Regions:
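Short glycine-rich substrate-engagement loop in P-loop NTPases that contacts/grips substrate
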Residues: 53-83
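Short regulatory helix/loop adjacent to the ATP-binding pocket of P-loop NTPases
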Residues: 121-137, 152-153
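Conserved lysine of the Walker
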Residues: 33
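Hydrophobic anchor at the beta1->P-loop junction of P-loop NTPases
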Residues: 25
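Hydrophobic positions on the alpha1 helix immediately C-terminal to the Walker A/P-loop
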Residues: 36, 40
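N-terminal pre-Walker A segment at the start of P-loop NTPase domains
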Residues: 1-14
Length: 402
């Protein structure tokens, strides 16, 4: 099996090395953090001045490393003072009080630390407290469409796009030949591991049945504006009593695993964020489809929106949902530089009513920021309709907002 280099992420790691900072790779389990860490290990192993200290907490040979004392002892037993020591630890959140180790060795000369973790609360909140925020977080996403084509040696065509939309971008699918039955079984195993290890065990969840129902509800309502209160009411109607506070806590726990992402609403006129009624998207559209039935009629727009959201994040945008009086803009995308774009997602612009709705919402925004409609309308690759750019989904995933 060909070893595919995820160069953009390795470049980000390289740029952060040598700056007396801890590099933290974060993201959902099985998204490729371990793969990247091994690639970094293999690249640095070619350097005679480098000494690699590698710990993978998912491998049985490292079971004895349970807390920071064990980790310190392992590192001390493998350090070479005359070389640059690269301390690489995979799934570090499974080591009790790991923060003490990374804080201590960060200050050692000739030492670089790169760690991975699946739980954002463990990494972001506790590291900030214990090491004063002196770390670089690199968020690793599921495969992009371009990476998907490379991993699976596929041509760029509509059939490959359909596979990407349906099966998603977990790197582990490379081993399965994209057989849908095998893929769904693998995705369910990944999800079960995340729910058990990163949600139920870590948060002492006492109602796993509701947790399962909740994530299925979020899959079925991908891209819809929902609230904790509306979920609570829906669950009560299904015979399951749950408070809005409990819903909020369960969703927070899910977001901390990176399986789902909460997207706030943004008041375009008032230029402020709303404090309630958000949208949720899945890190991997394949896992979303595993839960929500990606081949069902009516699901395609939900999945498309999920795919577009993730690619906008991949392009470096902070993404919110736009509220414009009574109408909605699917995505308001901004960067720290002040750049902003508006994006509407539609499956097919098949008639004038659809065109009026999708383009009309964007025309109601009276500013000069770029505006896009992304669709799968046949024969459309890129067109300009009175200043609103209509992009084909495949072109967007290949080339970005062009």
């Amino acid at each position: 099996m060909k070893n595919i280099i995820r160069r953009p992420y390795l470049d980000k790691i390289e740029q952060a090395l040598g700056k007396d900072t801890i590099i933290v790779l974060v993201g959902q389990r099985r998204i490729g953090k371990s793969y990247l860490l091994r690639q970094l290990r293999d690249e640095k192993a070619q350097d005679s001045s480098a000494n690699i200290i590698f710990v993978d907490k998912e491998k049985k040979e490292f079971d004895d490393i349970r807390d920071y004392h064990d980790l310190n002892a392992f590192i001390d037993g493998h350090r070479v003072k005359e070389k640059t020591n690269y301390i690489l630890v995979d799934e570090i959140q499974d080591i009790a009080e790991f923060e003490r180790t990374v804080r201590s060795y960060r200050e050692e000369p000739g030492t670089e630390i790169v760690i991975t973790g699946s739980n954002s609360f463990m990494l972001s909140s506790e590291l900030t407290t214990l090491i004063g925020g002196r770390y670089k977080e690199i968020y690793v996403q599921a495969l992009s469409y371009n990476e998907f084509l490379t991993f699976h040696q596929l041509p760029d065509n509509d059939d490959s796009l359909a596979k990407y939309i349906n099966l998603g971008g977990l790197p582990g699918l490379q081993k399965m030949g994209l057989d849908e039955n095998d893929v769904r079984e693998y995705q369910q195993d990944v999800l079960n591991t995340v729910l058990l290890k990163d949600v139920i065990m870590r948060n002492n969840i006492r109602n796993p049945v509701f947790l399962d129902n909740l994530i299925r509800f979020l899959a079925d309502n991908t891209g819809k504006i929902i609230s904790a209160n509306s979920i609570s009411k829906f669950m009560r109607a299904q015979g399951q009593s749950i408070t809005s506070t409990a819903v909020i806590n369960y969703i927070k726990a899910l977001c901390e695993t990176y399986v789902i992402h909460k997207v706030n609403r943004f008041d375009i006129h008032g230029k402020r964020l709303f404090e309630s009624n958000d949208k949720y998207y899945f890190e991997d559209n394949g896992i979303r489809n595993c839960l929500g039935g990606g081949n069902r009629e009516g699901d395609i727009e939900k999945v498309m929106e999920n795919v577009v959201y993730n690619h906008l994040v991949r392009l470096g945008y902070e993404v919110t949902v736009g509220q414009l009086q009574a109408s909605e803009i699917d995505f308001v995308c901004s960067k720290p530089t002040g750049e902003r774009v508006y994006v509407q997602v539609a499956y097919i612009i098949a008639d004038e009513a659809t065109r009026k709705r999708e383009f009309g919402n964007l025309r109601a925004i009276h500013d000069n920021y770029p505006k896009y409609v992304i669709s799968m309308t046949p024969l459309v690759t890129r067109s300009d309709d009175d200043g609103i750019i209509h992009l084909n989904l495949r072109k967007f995933l290949k080339e970005g907002l062009v």
